[in-house]
Amino acid sequence: MLQPSNRKYRKDFKGRNRGVASRGNRVSFGEFGLKATECARITARQLEAARRTIARHIKRGGKITIRIFPDKPITKKPLEVRQGKGKGSVEYWVALVQPGRMIFEIEGVDEALAREAFNRAAAKLPLKCLFVKRTVM
């Protein structure tokens, strides 16, 4: 599972996930990409499940690049504990994703295989995604 190795502070404020992605919104490392079309918090487990799905579908061919990293800790207090007494412990890690952000990229496979792999991976993620091809500038 992906998570930061060390941080200055263990816990974060909740924050808000708004706006559109101004960075990481182009296919940079591969030929095809899976692009987010809405805001979401993607957990490290969801990201790993989607990555495994892509890897299984494309088998030995191709290279997968993960363009997001779960670097935000989400805390939770234990069940049946009263409010107060400080913030809960870190339960899992998420990546905040805005519309337009590239999540995965693939290179070295044909378009039909990449499209099918991304469709299966998108089913594991909590947001709507779009299949995109690299545009040469």
From Swiss-Prot:
Q: Note the Pfam families from the entry.
A: Ribosomal_L16
Which InterPro entries does this UniProt record tie to the protein?
A: Ribosomal_uL16, Ribosomal_uL16_bact-type, Ribosomal_uL16_dom, Ribosomal_uL16_sf
Please provide the record's keywords in A-Z order.
Ribonucleoprotein, Ribosomal protein, RNA-binding, rRNA-binding, tRNA-binding
Region Disordered: what ranges?
1-20
Q: Which GO terms describe its molecular function?
A: rRNA binding; structural constituent of ribosome; tRNA binding
Alphabetical GO biological process terms:
translation
Q: What highest taxon heads this organism's lineage? A: Bacteria
Q: Compositional bias (Basic residues) spans? A: 7-17
User: What cellular-component terms does GO give this entry?
Assistant: cytosolic large ribosomal subunit
Determine if Ribosomal protein is one of this entry's keywords. Answer: yes
Q: Which HAMAP family match?
A: Ribosomal_uL16
Q: Function, please?
A: Binds 23S rRNA and is also seen to make contacts with the A and possibly P site tRNAs.
Regarding protein family, the annotation reads: Belongs to the universal ribosomal protein uL16 family.
Q: How does it assemble?
A: Part of the 50S ribosomal subunit.
Query: Any idea what this protein is called?
Result: Large ribosomal subunit protein uL16
Q: Which organism is it from?
A: Coxiella burnetii (strain CbuK_Q154) (Coxiella burnetii (strain Q154))
Q: Which gene encodes it?
A: rplP
